[in-house]
Regions:
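A conserved hydrophobic secondary-structure block that centers on an alpha-helix together
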Residues: 1-11
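Conserved beta-strand positions
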Residues: 1-2, 23-24, 98
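Short acidic/polar capping segments at secondary-structure boundaries
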Residues: 3-5, 27-28, 56-58
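Acidic, His- and aromatic-enriched active-site or binding-groove loops in soluble protein domains
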Residues: 11-52
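A generic short-segment signal for beta-strand/edge and adjacent turn/coil regions
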Residues: 18-22, 65, 101-102
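Active-site and substrate-binding clefts of carbohydrate-active enzymes
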Residues: 37-48, 52-55, 60, 67-70, ...
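Active-site glycine- and acidic-residue-rich loops that bind
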Residues: 74
Length: 214
């Protein structure tokens, strides 16, 4: 799901498609006082489990790693693991989600990002830390949801607003989006793999992103 776009309704649709777990943003305006470091359940279909991104710890790597004005620079693997294991990071599962472009584009090779990532697994798996890695399925199976997550409005990990205005923030992409999806039944009626292929590519989020003015 692009940029972790999620809402109660989207989660219910995903559950109806047969999925049992979904990734979403641990947005403050949705979580409130709750921690992203637990498994949650969809508000409409509680069979769908949710793993929420710890945006602070994720962005420490994705955006702040090479920022020399950051008061925690330089970030080493040992320092980062101390944060993961700290009492100030309570919970059962810490989800670190970031774009692939973090590695090599946002954080170029000369920042030391690749050396950091090579050192991180060994530091995490040190016995004294009592931590382990888990796949999405493993984490969702191991831990029970602590509560339902209510998210009536669509959220994402994009920008400060944590919404979808990065793609649907003005009349131009909004109109393009509406007209595109208005063709759904017509495209389906054609029963043409070629048209299906083209229509699916027209749904690429970047088309709408580059119409944005924010």
């Amino acid at each position: 799901n692009t940029e972790l776009i999620y809402s109660d309704e989207i989660g219910a649709m995903v559950a109806d498609m047969g999925f049992r777990t979904m990734l979403a943003e641990g947005a403050k305006h949705v979580l409130g006082w709750k921690s992203p470091n637990y498994v949650y359940a969809n508000a409409i279909n509680q069979k769908l489990r949710l793993l929420l991104r710890n945006y602070k710890l994720s962005d420490d790597i994705a955006f702040r790693f090479s920022n020399r004005s950051w008061d925690e620079w330089p970030l080493t693997a040992d320092k980062y693991v101390k944060w993961l294991a700290s009492d100030e990071t309570p919970g059962e599962v810490i989800n670190l989600f970031m774009d692939y472009e973090t590695f090599g584009e946002h954080q170029t090779a000369d920042t030391g990002i690749f050396e950091f990532m090579r050192a991180l697994p060994k530091a995490i798996l040190a016995k004294k830390n009592d931590m382990e890695f888990a796949t999405v399925s493993e984490a969702a199976k191991k831990y029970q949801p602590v509560s339902v997550l209510h998210c009536p409005h669509v959220m994402s990990w994009a920008d400060e607003e944590r919404d979808v205005t990065a793609w649907l923030g003005n009349e131009v992409p909004n109109e393009a989006f509406s007209k595109l999806y208005a063709q759904k039944e017509k495209v389906a009626s054609l029963k043409s793999p070629d048209f299906d292929y083209v229509w699916s590519f027209m749904q690429t989020s970047d088309h709408f992103y580059y119409m944005a003015t924010k």
